[in-house]
Structure formats: structure tokens, C-alpha cells
Amino acid sequence: MPTLEIQSEKFTLKADLYGNLPAKRAVVLVHGSSWDALGWRDIAPHFVERGVAALAVNLRGFDGSSGKTGRYVPGKPWSPATDVKAAVALLRERGVREVALVGASLGGSAALGAAMEEDVESVVTISAPVKAVPDEMSALVRGRKLYVCAIGDTLGAAPNVLASFKALKPPKQLLFFGGKEHSRGMFAAPYGPEALEAIVSFVARGSPG
């Protein structure tokens, strides 16, 4: 598993690559606030098995990445979204034609922020957005969208996930699971295999042609 360096503004990010580049399709995996890119190590190979290279990025201040991750303020520049856009740019420089984003909790909000400005093929959020997002911002998210959340999410994300989903433009899909798990904790729940399969299949489907 090689480690790549990504320039995001004046900062250097570390990212773990699963699979090979160049590739037709790749996914950027974005971690939550209490873990880092290594937390995707058991998830990323599932994408590779479906022909999708996976780049698990460490946001600023996490596991070797320089800088510090900033706080989210709606409508303001936000470093995690900028970091995700930098990862997308690196993949395109490496010959990737279709880029998907998958983010959990903080990472899900970062993926949404990036997808408001980048022409990504698809974006998947897990337990995100945790905080409310204005409808006009959710409407800007590009590509195919899949929101995945536990109905009893311990951080109370479910209502904000639903509100954001309603404001999204199609194509879009929402999956609520019975439980209270948050972020990557969903993968360890009884419904975890079903949730993982739904996410991987959604990303691997790609665009027609």
C-alpha cells in the first residue's frame, strides 16, 4: 500500500493508495474527526475488488498531514473540503476519468463540500451531514448521491441527513438503517455488511459507457 503526498494549498497531505493508477475509476475515502485514513484499511479493498482504485486521504493535522483541520461554518471556505478537492485533482492528474467521493461524519460533510464545486461522478455520505446544511448548498452537490445513516444516530445526524437529502437534485438515494451507530461504527453493526455492499455497489456502478 503506497503512500502518496497531496498538496492542498500550502499544506502536504498523506494518503494511502489501494489498487493502481492510472485507472478509469477511483474513489476518495475521507475519514471522520476521531480517526484517520488507516480506518479505511478493511473497507478500501472492497472497492479494489470491483475495479475501483481507492485513495484514503488524511485531512490536515491527521497522521502525517501538515496543518490543522478547521471548523465548519456554512458558506465559508472549509479546509476539509479543500483537501478533498486536492485529492480529486491528484487522481485526475494520474489519469482517473471518473472520481467518486465517500466520506464518514466529518468526512461526509467534506465530500459534500467538494462535490458542490467538483464534477465528481458520485458522492456517498455516511452519517453526514451531522450539522444542518442550508438547502441552497445541498442543491449544489453534483453527481449521483447516496446518503447512508442509522435512524437513531448517536450524534443526532439523521434529521439533518434527511433535510439535506430532500434538497438534493436527482439522481439521489437514501438508506436509513435501524440502529444508533455513527460513522464507521455502522460497518460493525448487524446491518454492516448490507450497508457496505450498498456503498461499494453504488460507487462501482459508475456512469454508463
Per-segment meaning from a language model:
Residues K24-G32:
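Short beta-strand element of the alpha/beta-hydrolase
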Residues V141, Y147-C149:
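Short beta-strand/loop motif that positions the catalytic acidic residue
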Residues S33-P45, A158-P159:
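The serine-hydrolase catalytic nucleophile loop
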